[in-house]
């Protein structure tokens, strides 16, 4: 589905999705990221480790990735292929947490954010808590010490990640791990990511960050 969505956006804009994102979001926000790691410098990326300590992707393998030259050629990168730091991903999460704005600039309309947060259907899974599926985002009540959170998870080549934000307070947390064992908690979240996120939410409340 994300492959089709990415390719559709490319057809609509007449350019690679990554080029559109660079111009519309990444460059104005000071974000260094790309769906094509070949656009980044070797020193900007980290080696990716599996849970046994074996390297899954070296820095050179990542930055040696071929960069598509025509729309549609890079569609397979769009489901989970974004290379970005936790700090820069937090900037993108801030857009959602603040109804489309970041540092006084509007990047998405409030209506677009509301559409992304609209529940499409509920999902029940054996062994984990049910969640509401929105557009890309998921939502749960009583999660990580908050009344409700929107969130998105990701995993590839030893990386487990979790971004989340509280629509009531406008804050959020991003955790990206490499080399952690595969573990899913009773809420369906990667265990280490969830534990770190909960501690960070608690710290923000305690110190009013």
Question: Which residue ranges define each predicted feature?
Answer:
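Short, surface-exposed loop or secondary-structure junction motifs
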Residues: 1-150
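Short, gly/Ser/Thr-rich active-site loops of penicillin-recognizing serine hydrolases
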Residues: 117-122, 128, 180-209
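Polar/charged alpha-helical tracts
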Residues: 43-50, 111-114, 168, 191, ...
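Hydrophobic alpha-helix feature that most strongly marks membrane-spanning transmembrane helices
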Residues: 94-97, 101, 121, 168, ...
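Short, well-ordered beta-strand elements
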Residues: 160-180
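Short loop/turn motifs at secondary-structure junctions and domain boundaries
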Residues: 154-157
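Short glycine-rich loop/turn motifs
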Residues: 134-135, 159-161
